[in-house]
From Swiss-Prot:
Motif Q motif mapped to chain: 94-122
Region (Transactivation domain): 477-614
Upper taxonomic lineage: Eukaryota, Metazoa, Chordata, Craniata, Vertebrata
Record: residues binding ATP: F114, T115, E116, Q121, A138, Q139, T140, G141, S142, G143, K144, T145
Documented EC number(s): 3.6.4.13
Organism: Pongo abelii (Sumatran orangutan)
Modified residues (Phosphoserine): S24, S480, S520
SMART domains: DEXDc, HELICc, P68HR
Post-translational modification, as annotated: Sumoylated; sumoylation, promoted by PIAS1, promotes interaction with HDAC1 and transcriptional repression activity. Sumoylation also significantly increases stability, and reduces polyubiquitination.
Function statement: Involved in the alternative regulation of pre-mRNA splicing; its RNA helicase activity is necessary for increasing tau exon 10 inclusion and occurs in a RBM4-dependent manner. Binds to the tau pre-mRNA in the stem-loop region downstream of exon 10. The rate of ATP hydrolysis is highly stimulated by single-stranded RNA. Involved in transcriptional regulation; the function is independent of the RNA helicase activity. Transcriptional coactivator for androgen receptor AR but probably not ESR1.
Name of the protein in question: Probable ATP-dependent RNA helicase DDX5
Domain Helicase ATP-binding span(s) in chain numbering: 125-300
Length: 614
């Protein structure tokens, strides 16, 4: 059999002998929940003479690769934008057969119709197979999962069989349950072919099936930090057999605050392990983690060294105001849904916005579903399945799905709310244009996001994208201190209204209505402050004054159609007026805008006209 051979016969039955190091027949310990995850775990003081030695260098350079000159290697790396740092880095493989994987692995690769390794696979496989620690920095959708899974299979095949009570040989830590499940789906097919066992453990799902998998013994465990900490604390599994550690999307795990849990977990693993860290960015926090966990590692970077987006994505930025987003989204979805390939992810900032927007769109007949962290695992799995199979081609999501969500045919990404950082922006739009395909990303950028405008322009320029002139204007206004309106951009909607008739903005003159009040309901109430601090209220939709208007201590009722009552003006005189009085004074001795007496407007269907609040 070509490829890597080992003394492990996967066909023979596995007997349960005496437990080796790391195992116990005493059964699982009863555990309790703690406020500080992992505080029950004690850092192990490793004596490397105690556990058995293990082999981690299995790399056999293919003859075709050995004949390749240094100049040819450099030309290939330059063409694929591969940057390598570290000593004695192996040459990249240009074809699958040059990696010398076992025949059953090659059969699965052939069934999946892969033509050639991606850039991160070409350079990452020789490094991982050599037993070296490595850091891989590459954009989303670049094939990172197979970059560490296939060398893991080779590594496992050269280790002794698991005994009862042994933990996994390969541990993959992932930031979210969605990413963990996707890694498990990729691993499952290769594990079946190689007669290995894998499992996925994550929060939000029943513990029973996950515990049974661990007790039966698995070579590969894909886990989120929180659930793994739970199982380690109560003795459901252990990591003393773990010799191959993968930190997938390390930057995301740090963003989510998992660093203490990661350190607790790594303390349970023998220090002579092989460690592979994968990330889409290379901030100082990730660099520090690499320095702490990795030894003499090889750093592989795919693409530009600075923050960069996938160049296969067309990025379109629309500078607008918050109240315009809904209408713009509907117009955009009408165009997208007319396309044959129309699978779309809409990213929003909050869980509440996700639920509200999902309800609005479904109410108006759009095939949309929402996903965020507060939904149950069963509901999240169902929503993702419906989205993947095209039954609901519009997915509205918070950042819980912005990384690791691997759906091959996502054609469009819409940033309804701009994220908090350009790193998150790059990860969001990276849900499209997976595996060398193309895609389009639309972004609604408001003046409230002005702090991110410079970084966004840098990302657009690096990817050779057209830059909206309004973005450049925001930078100019911000730099010169000429910021106008809320958030630094002039509110040009006011120019569409003549003086005294800005019903969408002010009831009375702007300066004297500075501290007006608004309600958040569809029927907007405008308030004008009087001398004594009371407020009048005008219902925007039916043209009538509401009840209980108070001015200078006098309570007066205003009713639709024929308002009568008393009103005290700025000269402390009281006048009686009826329905035909043309000029009312507002307590500040200024002319009030006369609302037309119109019939009540019907409920406005979504999307709402620009004259109404959105």
């Amino acid at each position: 059999m070509s490829g890597y051979s080992s003394d492990r016969d996967r066909g023979r039955d596995r007997g349960f002998g005496a437990p080796r190091f790391g195992g116990s027949r005493a059964g699982p310990l009863s555990g309790k929940k703690f406020g500080n995850p992992g505080e029950k775990l004690v850092k192990k003081k490793w004596d490397l003479d105690e556990p058995p030695k293990f082999e981690k260098n299995f790399y056999q350079e293919h003859p075709d690769l050995a004949r390749r000159t240094a100049q040819e290697v450099e030309t290939y790396r330059r063409s694929k934008e591969i940057t390598v740092r570290g000593h004695n880095c192996p040459k990249p493989v240009l074809n699958f057969y040059e990696a010398n994987f076992p025949a059953n692995v090659m059969d699965v690769i052939a069934r999946q119709n892969f033509t050639e390794p991606t850039a991160i696979q070409a350079q990452g496989w020789p490094v991982a197979l050599s037993g070296l620690d490595m850091v891989g920095v590459a954009q989303t959708g670049s094939g990172k999962t197979l970059s560490y899974l296939l060398p893991a299979i080779v590594h496992i095949n050269h280790q002794p069989f698991l005994e009862r009570g042994d933990g996994p040989i390969c541990l993959v830590l992932a930031p979210t349950r969605e990413l963990a499940q996707q890694v498990q789906q990729v691993a499952a097919e290769y594990c079946r072919a190689c007669r290995l066992k894998s499992t996925c453990i994550y929060g939000g799902a029943p513990k029973g099936p996950q515990i049974r998998d661990l007790e039966r013994g698995v070579e590969i465990c894909i886990a989120t930090p929180g659930r793994l900490i739970d199982f380690l604390e109560c003795g459901k599994t252990n990591l003393r057999r773990t010799t191959y550690l993968v930190l997938d999307e390390a930057d995301r795990m740090l963003d989510m605050g998992f660093e203490p849990q990661i350190r607790k977990i790594v303390d349970q693993i023998r220090p002579d392990r092989q460690t592979l860290m994968w990330s889409a960015t290379w901030p100082k926090e990730v660099r520090q983690l690499a320095e702490d966990f990795l030894k003499d590692y090889i750093h592989i970077n795919i693409g530009a060294l600075e923050l960069s987006a996938n160049h296969n994505i067309l990025q379109i930025v629309d500078v607008c105001h918050d109240v315009e987003k809904d209408e713009k989204l509907i117009r955009l979805m009408e165009e997208i849904m007319s396309e044959k390939e129309n699978k779309t992810i809409v990213f929003v900032e909050t869980k509440r916005r996700c639920d509200e927007l999902t309800r609005k769109m479904r109410r108006d007949g759009w095939p949309a579903m929402g996903i965020h962290g507060d939904k149950s695992q069963q509901e999240r799995d169902w929503v993702l399945n419906e989205f993947k199979h095209g039954k609901a081609p519009i997915l509205i999501a918070t950042d819980v799905a912005s990384r690791g969500l691997d759906v091959e045919d996502v054609k469009f990404v819409i940033n309804y709310d701009y994220p908090n950082s350009s790193e998150d922006y790059i990860h969001r739009i990276g849900r499209t244009a997976r595996s060398t395909k193309t895609g389009t990303a639309y972004t609604f950028f408001t003046p409230n996001n002005i702090k991110q405008v410079s970084d966004l322009i840098s990302v657009l320029r690096e990817a050779n994208q057209a830059i909206n002139p309004k973005l450049l204007q925001l930078v100019e206004d911000r730099g010169s201190g000429r910021s106008r309106g809320r958030g630094g951009m002039k509110d040009d909607r006011r120019d569409r209204y003549s003086a005294g008739k800005r019903g969408g903005f002010n009831t009375f003159r702007d300066r004297e209505n500075y501290d007006r009040g608004y309600s958040s309901l569809l029927k907007r109430d405008f308030g004008a402050k009087t001398q004594n601090g009371a407020y009048s209220a005008a219902n925007y939709t039916n043209g009538s004054f509401g009840s209980n208007f108070v001015s200078a201590g006098i309570q007066t009722s205003f009713r639709t159609g024929n308002p009568t009552g008393t009103y005290q003006n700025g000269y402390d005189s009281t006048q009686q007026y009826g329905s035909n009085v043309p000029n009312m004074h507002n307590g500040m001795n200024q002319q009030a805008y006369a609302y037309p007496a119109t019939a009540a407007a019907p409920m406005i269907g979504y999307p709402m006209p620009t004259g109404y609040s959105q």
